[in-house]
C-alpha cells in the first residue's frame, strides 16, 4: 500500500493546523506523507492500518521487525511536543505509554500501541474509574521533574499579570469577583510552585486500555509543579453526564476526596491550584473573546468552596 493511501489527512486536522499555524501549518501537513515514508524506512516499520488523528497529531499504526505493535505519532515540533518526549523518556513507561523511539528533528514519536477503542470513560462506575486515574496520576507525579522542563511558577506568574486585563473584560460583577478570588488563591501559592513532573491533561479520555498493564496514561503535556495543578482534568471528566444526573456537588467532592487521599495532597493547596487551572482556562477564554466565565468552571468552584 502506498504511503499516500495510508496517510489520509483528516480535514479537521488540516484546518486546525492552517488556523493555528498559518503557512507553517499548511506546509507541515503537505509534507506529512514524505515524512511518514522516511520514518517507516529508517525504523524498518510496516504500516498496519490506516492513519487516524487526534486534536493536534496524526497517528499511524505500525509493526516493528520483531512483530511488536506500535504507533507513529506525528505533530508539529513545538515546546509542548519536546516536553512530552522529555516526560515520556523520564517516566519510561511507568503508568504511561512507553516511548520506543523518537526523531529529534521532526519530534515524531514511536510509541507502544494501546487500545484506542477503550478509554477509561468506558468504566461506568465513577469511583472505580477515578480510582484507576488517581493511581496512575500518583505514579506520574511521584517523579521529580528533570531540569529544563517548563515550570508552574513561571506559568502562574504570567497568569497573575494577565488578571487585571481579564477582569476588565468580564461583563458580570460576580464573574469579576470570582476571577479575582481564583487569582488570590494562586498568589498565595505561587512562591512554592512544586517540583513534580505533571501530566497536565489526565482525564478519562487520556487513559487507554493496554496489554502490559490494564490501563496507561497517554498524551502528557509535562511541566514541573505542584500535583494539585493536575487535578482539574480529572474533576471535569464526563462533565455533561454528571450535570445531567443533577449530582455535580457530590461527584466533584467525592472525586476531590479520592484524588487528594490517593496522592497524599494537602487539601487546601490542592483546591488552590485547582482554582489556578480554572483561572488559566478563563484567561484563555477571555483572550478568545469571551466576556463571561464558563458556567461549568463556576459550578466546579462552588462545589469545592468550603469542602
UniProtKB/Swiss-Prot annotation:
Key words of the record: Antibiotic resistance, ATP-binding, Kinase, Nucleotide-binding, Transferase
GO biological process, one term: response to antibiotic
Keyword Nucleotide-binding recorded: yes
Enzyme Commission (EC) number: 2.7.1.72
Gene3D superfamilies the record matches: Transferase(Phosphotransferase) domain 1
Alphabetized SUPFAM superfamilies for the sequence: Protein kinase-like (PK-like) (SSF56112)
Superkingdom of the source species: Bacteria
InterPro entries according to UniProt: Kinase-like_dom_sf (IPR011009), NH2Glyco/OHUrea_AB-resist_kin (IPR006748)
Top EC class of this enzyme: transferase
Binding site for streptomycin: 133-145
Catalysed reactions, semicolon-separated: streptomycin + ATP = streptomycin 6-phosphate + ADP + H(+)
Active-site residues, as the UniProt record annotates them: 201
GO MF annotation: an example: ATP binding
Pfam families cross-referenced by the UniProt entry: APH_6_hur
Tagged with keyword Hydrolase: no
Function summary: The aminoglycoside phosphotransferases achieve inactivation of their antibiotic substrates by phosphorylation.
UniProt family annotation: Belongs to the aminoglycoside phosphotransferase family.
Name by which UniProt lists this protein: Streptomycin 6-kinase
Gene: sph
